[in-house]
Amino acid sequence: MDNNKSNHNSKINSFKGHKVLVIGDTHDSPNIPKDRFLWIGKHIKKIKPDYVVHIGDFSSFDSLSYFQANDTQQGKLKDAFMVDILSMRTALALINKGMGNVQVPKHITLGNHEQRVHKFEEKIPEIEGMMKDQLYQSFHSSNWTVSEYGSIFFVSGVGFTHVPKNIMGKEYGGRNAEISIANDCLHDLVFGHTHKDRDWKAPKIGDKQFVRIVNVGCALPMNHVERYAKLNMTGWSYGIVELSIWDNHIQEKNFVSMDRLEREYGKN
């Protein structure tokens, strides 16, 4: 018997890492196709990760957008809040449908678009808690746990958040956001928000010391650009991300495009 082969197999069987499927910003809304949520659920069923993490901005909540005032022409065309909530619940149900009987812990790190619910309620004290209750109950009833916008959720030493904030309480951004985050962060971090798939590994002084920052892109329909970004530079990345984590670091990363998800699951 090959002892080296036996030892190798023993190491594989005793692997204590975690496989995490990360879903980037999905920006669900009543007018955007929802079949992608079913595809994502089917992919979860296929690969059976240890965790599923949605990086936030599950829904756009354009009904609460403060960029279009209610007394403007565009503002008058906005959907009601409950229309957005019912749309989100349909999307959540499609993920569960695709997963079938596979049971995987699911967590969402709320994004700035979910934060719109908080900001709207703050202006109307009489309805405090009512809209947030609709938001949180939608996730809890579909078996998702939730962390607040700006907080960091950890899996095996790796942090997950919609977008990290700097010392001034502002979101990291710009052309070199990942580099800036790596300079300031003490652990590997996974985030979204910019809709761009980027991966930066920064070496640190010391034996085997480094920080890896992964931006997961977005999970919108392929080549869809949100209305607010029509005239902006985009270069968005459309897909979901598989991560393998051990030794408190992201060791492997695989980006699965929305095109591939559609080819594999779209006609099943």
Features from the language model and the residues they span:
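A short acidic (Asp/Glu
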Residues: 32-34, 62-66, 117-122, 171-173, ...
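Conserved beta-sheet core of the metallophosphoesterase superfamily
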Residues: 161-254
